[in-house]
């Protein structure tokens, strides 16, 4: 079938594959592409030949960093597939992929079950209400345990799994699955080539009883969610397979339950049932319905868009990448209407006109040109100059802004110095392009040292970015040791602080008076907001046009905190009153007054230092448990829980990021290489007084 967008949206699925690093996500994706006829040769991650991993570093490191989008077909249905990274440093990639997906397949390792990263990605999918299927992969692995993995889905994710298949055998003897709907065995005995169809056989005698028990559980779980089915079930009437499937689809799309399948992608067993399930149970764009948006000029006015070609054009840019030949590629999910090459549209987030140069449907990093981009599909646009991740594109005559995406602040920074003058220029270009692609990559100039400081979500994240500067932009640079991204905040409210900015030199002077109040801001659950500004000025004592300048002045001053020059967060500023002068007042005067008022108020508000705390999970053999816990305590960490997992001990702790540099080597030497760990950013916490004094002294030289 030609790679063109299907007009019948009921036959379209926009899905992603999400998982913990090493759960076999990229291999699962590769198999899907092979089975749907896109790939003629199967790429393996450990050979560095995987199709979806198309950046040099991904091939080298055997991990997926960027989410490439691919279109493929299965039984006359079109699947637009987005590959997402499983490494914690790349959560922003996962977040922006989930934002534009209609459904996802969560891949779990049959031995490990739900791991910390799977849990984090699952919660991100909850945030965007993404319906999911579960695929328990690596059933051929030593220690694989399907039933344990299903239990971890219940215990750790609080989710309701619907077991659709039972494994036949495990580890080296994994040969197939029992299809609990059809009550047949799908067998792939021995070593099978990619694409091998299963033989359909009777259920092995030793599994018959278990299969009947699990089928009964499945039908009961499905029936209890529908009154009519429940009555028929208790009356002993037969419920047809089609009726069960229809209700499973309903439960899955509503996020009430999650169908669970199993197999081994690497050994080519269990892939076809997952493809069938994507079509049977995950939603099409019509099921998802209208997308919420608002009027760019007035956010109070709602503007919703239906997934139809007849509606005005609206789309969300969810990824920007630099292509070696075409330059800037913008990945876009089209929600309504359509657009053709050459059309003029508007970036309604930034209120800037854009022109569509070329349009492609992507197969990993190979492009298939198309003339039109239409509702319900994912495309790569070329020629968009001002569009970055999270921006809305819409019809110029009917602008709309779709919901924004939230991105976390960086937790780790490094100073980077170009080696030569020409590297200085190249570094500027590289930083600008990489920042366009990745909203969690930040750049700032350290005013004290004059160095360029780049920030990101972890050591691997920054390694990859620096590596890309060298490879793609030929920048030679010295990179400093990683620094923790500390923050400052206040603990005490300041009810009233008055500041007057006044300058009188020949001609017109400068005048602005502001009275502000400050208080600590407690961010709402799940919100990335760390600042709030409230205007309580009455009677025109400060003209309306100057109030945004006060706000801007306060925000500018928050970039450099009082204690050690770290950014200020979690502050609520209220502009109470002020005064102006007909001639001498200006936006600049009020901006300066806002900045100085904040600085003086913070000094009185009991400022403190904050540091990023990491949620660390360590898996260790029992005999090293004491060493591991002692080490966590010596790093100012606190152990929150301990549990058993497949013969090992799991220690969960909160540890300051500053104490985790070089931890991997220390852990290996303490446990003879038998323990491993993972960590994700948890929250910011106050630094103990004695440690804070050291940090401030080192930073300020006092």
From Swiss-Prot:
Gene3D superfamilies for this protein: 3.30.230.10, 3.30.70.240, Elongation Factor G (Translational Gtpase), domain 3, P-loop containing nucleotide triphosphate hydrolases, Translation factors
Family: Belongs to the TRAFAC class translation factor GTPase superfamily. Classic translation factor GTPase family. EF-G/EF-2 subfamily.
Name listed for the protein in its UniProt record: Elongation factor G
Location relative to the cell: Cytoplasm
Keywords: Cytoplasm, Elongation factor, GTP-binding, Nucleotide-binding, Protein biosynthesis
Alphabetical list of InterPro entries matching this protein: EFG_II, EFG_III, EFG_III/V, EFG_IV, EFG_V, EFG_V-like, EFTu-like_2, G_TR_CS
Any one GO biological process: ribosome disassembly
Chain sites annotated for binding GTP: 19-26, 83-87, 137-140
Alphabetized Pfam families for the sequence: EFG_C (PF00679), EFG_III (PF14492), EFG_IV (PF03764), GTP_EFTU (PF00009), GTP_EFTU_D2 (PF03144)
Location of the tr-type G domain: 10-286
GO cellular component term, pick one: cytoplasm
PROSITE patterns noted in UniProt: G_TR_1, G_TR_2
Protein function: Catalyzes the GTP-dependent ribosomal translocation step during translation elongation. During this step, the ribosome changes from the pre-translocational (PRE) to the post-translocational (POST) state as the newly formed A-site-bound peptidyl-tRNA and P-site-bound deacylated tRNA move to the P and E sites, respectively. Catalyzes the coordinated movement of the two tRNA molecules, the mRNA and conformational changes in the ribosome.
GO MF terms, alphabetically ordered: GTP binding; GTPase activity; translation elongation factor activity
Organism encoding this protein: Corynebacterium urealyticum (strain ATCC 43042 / DSM 7109)
């Amino acid at each position: 079938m030609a790679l063109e967008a299907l007009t019948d949206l009921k036959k379209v699925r926009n899905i992603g594959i999400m998982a913990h690093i090493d759960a076999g996500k990229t291999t699962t994706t590769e198999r899907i592409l092979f089975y749907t006829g896109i790939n003629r040769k199967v790429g393996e991650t450990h050979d560095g030949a995987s199709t979806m991993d198309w950046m040099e570093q991904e091939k080298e490191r055997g991990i997926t960093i960027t989410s490439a989008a691919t279109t493929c077909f299965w039984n006359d249905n079109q699947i637009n597939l987005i590959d997402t990274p499983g490494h914690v440093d790349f959560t922003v990639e996962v977040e922006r992929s989930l934002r534009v997906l209609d459904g996802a397949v969560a891949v779990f390792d049959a031995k490990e079950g739900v791991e910390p990263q799977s849990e984090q990605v699952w919660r991100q999918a909850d945030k965007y209400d993404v319906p999911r299927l579960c695929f328990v992969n690596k059933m051929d692995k030593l220690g694989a345990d399907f039933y344990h993995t299903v239990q971890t889905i219940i215990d750790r994710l609080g989710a309701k799994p619907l077991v659709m298949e039972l494994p036949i055998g495990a580890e080296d003897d994994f040969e197939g699955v029992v299809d609990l709907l059809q009550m047949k065995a799908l067998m792939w005995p021995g070593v099978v080539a990619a694409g091998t169809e299963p033989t359909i056989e009777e259920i092995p005698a030793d599994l018959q009883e278990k299969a009947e028990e699990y089928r009964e559980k499945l039908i009961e779980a499905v029936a209890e969610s529908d009154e009519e089915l429940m009555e028929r079930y208790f009356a002993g009437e037969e419920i047809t397979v089609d009726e069960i499937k229809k209700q499973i689809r309903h439960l899955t799309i509503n996020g009430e339950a999650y169908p669970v399948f199993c197999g081994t992608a690497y050994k080519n067993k269990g892939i076809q049932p997952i493809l069938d399930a994507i079509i049977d149970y995950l939603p099409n764009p019509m099921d998802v319905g209208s997308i919420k948006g608002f009027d760019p000029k007035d956010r109070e006015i709602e503007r919703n868009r239906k997934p139809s070609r007849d509606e005005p054009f609206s789309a969300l840019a969810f990824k920007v990448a630099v292509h070696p030949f075409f330059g800037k590629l913008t990945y876009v999910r089209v929600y309504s209407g359509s657009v053709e090459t050459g059309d003029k549209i508007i970036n309604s987030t930034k209120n800037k006109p854009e022109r569509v140069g070329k349009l492609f449907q992507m197969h990993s990093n190979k492009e298939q040109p198309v003339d039109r981009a239409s509702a319900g599909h994912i495309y790569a646009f070329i020629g968009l100059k001002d569009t970055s991740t999270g921006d809305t594109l819409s019809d110029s005559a009917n602008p709309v802004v779709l919901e924004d995406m939230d991105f976390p602040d960086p937790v780790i920074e490094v100073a980077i110095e170009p080696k030569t003058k020409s590297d200085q220029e190249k570094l500027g270009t590289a930083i600008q392009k990489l920042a366009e692609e990745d909203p969690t990559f930040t750049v700032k100039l350290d005013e004290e040292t004059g160095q360029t400081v780049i920030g990101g979500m972890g050591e691997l994240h920054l390694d990859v970015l620096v590596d890309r500067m060298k490879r793609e932009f030929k920048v030679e640079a010295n990179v400093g040791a990683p620094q923790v991204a500390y923050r400052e905040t206040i603990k005490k409210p300041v009810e009233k602080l008055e500041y007057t900015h006044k300058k009188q030199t020949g001609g017109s002077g400068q005048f602005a008076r502001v009275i502000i109040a400050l208080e600590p801001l407690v961010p709402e659950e799940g919100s990335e907001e760390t600042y709030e500004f409230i205007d309580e000025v009455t009677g025109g004592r400060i003209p309306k046009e100057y109030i945004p300048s006060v706000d801007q002045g306060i925000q500018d001053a928050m970039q450099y905190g009082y204690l050690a020059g770290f950014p200020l967060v979690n502050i609520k500023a209220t502009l109470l009153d002020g005064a102006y002068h007909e001639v001498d007042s200006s936006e600049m005067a009020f901006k300066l007054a806002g900045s100085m008022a904040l600085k003086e108020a913070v000094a009185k508000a009991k400022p403190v230092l904050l540091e990023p705390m990491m949620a660390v999970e360590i898996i260790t053999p029992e005999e090293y448990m004491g060493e591991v816990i002692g080490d966590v305590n010596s790093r100012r960490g606190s152990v929150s829980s301990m549990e058993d997992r497949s013969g090992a001990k799991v220690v969960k702790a909160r540890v300051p990021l500053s104490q985790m540099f070089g931890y991997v080597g220390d852990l290996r030497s303490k446990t003879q290489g038998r323990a491993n760990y993972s960590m994700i950013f948890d929250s910011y916490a106050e630094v103990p007084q004695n440690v804070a004094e050291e940090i401030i002294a080192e930073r300020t030289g006092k």
